[in-house]
Design a protein with these regions (language model features):
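Conserved AdoMet/S-adenosylmethionine-binding subsite of the radical SAM
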Residues: 1-128
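C-terminal accessory extensions appended to soluble enzyme cores
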Residues: 108-160
Length: 160
């Protein structure tokens, strides 16, 4: 069974692997094939109480990826498009999938700002896998089929 864990914490890794390794028959190679670690990254620490700071989450994500695990970023809600883009740039090379979505109902996004974000995402080096949530495609009235190949649908399986 494939498992995706999503967190705003960075301080769980040592205890998590200590507990896993205590289980009879634990095989980290199997875990690497079936566990993906995701981190919510908004770039706005002050608005995320009881969360590890974004730089700590990014560091933990990099460590897990170096250890052989799949990783993903939930860049949502986008609080500020430029900040979200910077967080994505800061994690290039050790993130297997980016999920980008808007805050529903509480923020008045300028359509031009969201379009600029998508335009910049299309220019990222290495063509990382990106899933735009319906909040983004709906606002821009974009059909996912018109996006570049590295933009994936909700049926994308990061374990294949």
């Amino acid at each position: 069974i494939n498992v995706k864990l999503l967190t705003k914490r960075a301080d769980f890794v040592d205890e998590f692997f200590r507990l896993l390794s205590a289980v009879e028959g634990y095989d980290e190679e199997i875990c690497k094939r079936h566990i993906a670690f995701g981190f919510t990254l908004t770039g706005c620490d002050g608005q995320e109480g009881n969360s590890s700071p974004n730089p700590e989450r990014i560091s933990t994500m990099k460590q897990l990826h170096a250890r052989g695990y799949r990783t993903f970023v939930s860049a949502e809600p986008v609080i500020d498009p430029k900040t979200s883009l910077q967080v994505i740039r800061d994690t290039l090379g050790f993130c297997d999938l980016y999920k980008v979505g808007l805050l529903s109902g509480k923020k008045d996004y300028g359509k031009a700002d969201v379009q600029d974000l998508v335009d910049e995402l299309q220019k990222l080096p290495g063509k990382p896998k990106i899933y735009l949530k319906n909040s983004v495609t709906g606002m821009l009235k974009r059909d996912r089929n018109t996006l570049p190949d590295n933009f994936v649908g909700n049926d994308y399986n990061m374990f294949e």
